[in-house]
Amino acid sequence: MGLPPLLSLPSNSAPRSLGRVETPPEVVDFMVSLAEAPRGGRVLEPACAHGPFLRAFREAHGTAYRFVGVEIDPKALDLPPWAEGILADFLLWEPGEAFDLILGNPPYGIVGEASKYPIHVFKAVKDLYKKAFSTWKGKYNLYGAFLEKAVRLLKPGGVLVFVVPATWLVLEDFALLREFLAREGKTSVYYLGEVFPQKKVSAVVIRFQKSGKGLSLWDTQESESGFTPILWAEYPHWEGEIIRFETEETRKLEISGMPLGDLFHIRFAARSPEFKKHPAVRKEPGPGLVPVLTGRNLKPGWVDYEKNHSGLWMPKERAKELRDFYATPHLVVAHTKGTRVVAAWDERAYPWREEFHLLPKEGVRLDPSSLVQWLNSEAMQKHVRTLYRDFVPHLTLRMLERLPVRREYGFHTSPESARNF
């Protein structure tokens, strides 16, 4: 097996800096129950450490397999004698052979500067990763690269079983990964929720087979005996679209209204560095200055214009130099308040450092009060909770675009009408 030059890890590298999180035994057992390989087949655990998945698979399925573990950290590699341990960076490793089964818990986190991201020890090879993986996009999480690499190392018909954060189901950074999985074989997703102790991360198990097509979505029920899978829906023609827990009720609601993205241009606020560079921005209040607002100023149905949470002030009339829509009263929807909808109408047109800003498209006439009331309603919160559960810690652009709005909730369209704020 060919080994690339091994990244020199700092002697004090902590598991967190490598993206490693211990897998609860009940999760390991559930994943092993989904795993399969032909007798005599090759079974691989990436980022293996002491090989919990190899050990559990061998105990459940027997010894008639060739077991291989790959680990980048020499201090962590501790496999039993019946398994072959390889010290290598899995993402750059080229074994020259394919595998029947790959299972495990890949590291997760964004590779970047130590001041911002916990997985900073891989920063030296990040450019190599970006060149190696066709699914790398945006602030790609390391587990996405592990998924692509593992799929490429499978034999035809081979099986992959990983436990990963649920974020890949909906985030735009994983759009290429979802499309890649849809092209390469059959994907099954099992929702577990927050099963990692002391981690605010919602997890799913992905079972991928390098044959067939389509998506199966499963819920699970946990008991003393482990996780029981419950089939939610099957999508035989899945092409990599975002994955949601749709119900008859959510489908009816979406059919009955227009997507918010069809009615509004959705814009992003200027960021802190832009404000700090602007010559009119001050760090102390003064005559003619207003607070630069943040998500903490946005409440369900109203805006707190008085408190300053950003530590920045500026003349309101100059805010349009940062974003032109700051000059116009408009709809503001939270990006930073979890997977729920918090909306208000910014009638004073203040500068904002955060959140989504929605401007009506040509021909859309609005009743701001009714629209805001609908977006903050319990019916809307239930709709979002049902579809997206706790996949991500914030409302995303793609989620926002698809929120349904019926005409009785504050809008109508006509070719002749102009914008009415």
UniProtKB/Swiss-Prot annotation:
The outcome of changing residue 108 to A/G is:
Drastically reduces enzymatic activity; KM for both DNA and s-adenosylmethionine is not significantly changed
* Cited PROSITE patterns: N6_MTASE (PS00092)
Instruction: Determine the domain of life of the protein's source.
Output: Bacteria
Q: What is its EC number?
A: 2.1.1.72
Q: Does the keyword ATP-binding apply?
A: no
Disulphide bridges: none
Q: Which reaction does it catalyse?
A: a 2'-deoxyadenosine in DNA + S-adenosyl-L-methionine = an N(6)-methyl-2'-deoxyadenosine in DNA + S-adenosyl-L-homocysteine + H(+)
Q: Read off the PANTHER family from this record.
A: DNA METHYLTRANSFERASE YEEA-RELATED (PTHR33841), TYPE II METHYLTRANSFERASE M.HINDII (PTHR33841:SF6)
Family note? Belongs to the N(4)/N(6)-methyltransferase family.
Which protein, by its recorded name, is this? Type II methyltransferase M.TaqI
State the species of origin.
Answer: Thermus aquaticus
